[in-house]
Structure formats: C-alpha cells, structure tokens
C-alpha cells in the first residue's frame, strides 16, 4: 500500500526548502507550483483558460503569461480571485490526480507539496499531512525580501491565505521553520527516518 504525504504551509514558509531536503533524501515530490507553471506555459491548459478569461493584456511581449501582471489583476479584485480559483482549481486538481496516480504505481512513499492543500480540500488524498510552520512576522519578512514587496503588499498576500496557526489542527507533523537550516534539516531527516 502506497503512503502519500501532503506537504503544506503558506507563502514564504519554507516549503521549497523542505521539498528540496525531502528530494535529496531520495523521495519523490509532486510540486503543485511546478505543475501550475507547466499548465500556465504557452499553450498549456491554464494558459488557454486564463487568456480566454482575461484577454491578451495578461501576456508579455513574447506571448508568455506576465505573472506579476496576472497576479496583480487577480489579487486586486475579490471577484477575480473567486473566478480564478474556480477556473484554475479543476484543471490543477485533474493534473495533480493524474501525477499522483502515476507515482502510486512505482513508489511506496511519496510527497505532494500543495500550498492550498487544506483550503482546496485535498486532505482526503493523504495518509499524513506535514505543515511547514513559521511565525507570521518571519513569514512577512521573508515574503518582503524574496518578492521585493512592501509590507502592505505582503500583508495583503497573507490575508488571502488561511493563517498557518489555523492549519496546525490538520497536521500530522508540524515542521518548525523559525530556526536555521541545520535545525530544519534535522527535523525533516528525523521525520523521514520514522516513515
């Protein structure tokens, strides 16, 4: 029987770093963000759906999605956020299910990194859920530094996600990412050894 572990957190919580450590330990990880980027690539299913919905102003000079512009258009308007979620989630869910079913054929244990795992009701897909947790202030600082956001813009982005403190009750394991990389890696390696 295959064991599937869902990995979640919030924006700038450190999920990518955790995913990297898990992969380096020999486990397969389906990364929802990478799946979305492929679907949003020129000619992809999401690319087509977004282009039909918002028109060519979401494209850059090369005909690719202008992600910052797209993000601004979606986050600036609550109706756009709802439409975007409805439009994108079914396409993303379908692709993630396909990749999950493929890995079930070859892996005893694998992970799926899904930022909105709880919000988009993926919980039943998993035997365990690992939450990458970081304090809100640290999350804000990382988001501002990583994306060059003002504090106001970073707070706006966080306000559109379920707080990490609320996600704790869904987690089988909480990975505390408030410390340094060595401490983070030790936590993950300990958890992987218990599998």
UniProtKB/Swiss-Prot annotation:
Q: Determine if Kinase is one of this entry's keywords.
A: yes
Q: In which pathway does it act?
A: Cofactor biosynthesis; coenzyme A biosynthesis; CoA from (R)-pantothenate: step 5/5
The regions listed as transmembrane in this protein's record are none
Location within or outside the cell: Cytoplasm
MF annotations from Gene Ontology: ATP binding; dephospho-CoA kinase activity
Query: What keywords were assigned to this record?
Result: ATP-binding, Coenzyme A biosynthesis, Cytoplasm, Kinase, Nucleotide-binding, Transferase
In short, the EC number is 2.7.1.24
**Pfam families referenced in this protein's UniProt entry, alphabetically:** CoaE (PF01121)
So what family is this one in?
Belongs to the CoaE family.
What job does this protein perform?
A: Catalyzes the phosphorylation of the 3'-hydroxyl group of dephosphocoenzyme A to form coenzyme A.
Protein name per the record: Dephospho-CoA kinase
- Species source reads Streptococcus agalactiae serotype V (strain ATCC BAA-611 / 2603 V/R)
Gene name in the database record: coaE
């Amino acid at each position: 029987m295959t064991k599937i572990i869902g990995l979640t957190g919030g924006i700038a919580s450190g999920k990518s770093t955790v995913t990297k450590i898990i992969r380096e330990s020999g486990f397969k990880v389906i990364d929802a963000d990478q799946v979305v980027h492929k679907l949003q690539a020129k000619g992809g299913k999401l690319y087509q759906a977004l282009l039909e919905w918002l028109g060519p102003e979401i494209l850059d000079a090369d005909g690719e999605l202008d992600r910052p512009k797209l993000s601004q258009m979606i986050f600036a308007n609550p109706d756009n956020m709802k439409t975007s979620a409805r439009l994108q989630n079914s396409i993303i869910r379908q692709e993630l299910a396909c990749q999950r079913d493929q890995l079930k054929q070859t892996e005893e244990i694998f992970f799926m990194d899904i930022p909105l795992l709880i919000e988009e009701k993926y919980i039943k897909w998993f035997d365990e859920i690992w939450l990458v947790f970081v304090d809100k202030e640290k999350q804000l600082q990382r988001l501002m530094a990583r994306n060059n956001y003002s504090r106001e813009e970073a707070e706006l982005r966080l306000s559109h996600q379920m707080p990490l403190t609320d996600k704790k009750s869904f987690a089988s394991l909480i990975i505390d990412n408030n410390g340094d990389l060595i401490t983070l890696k030790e936590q993950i390696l300990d958890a992987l050894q218990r599998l």
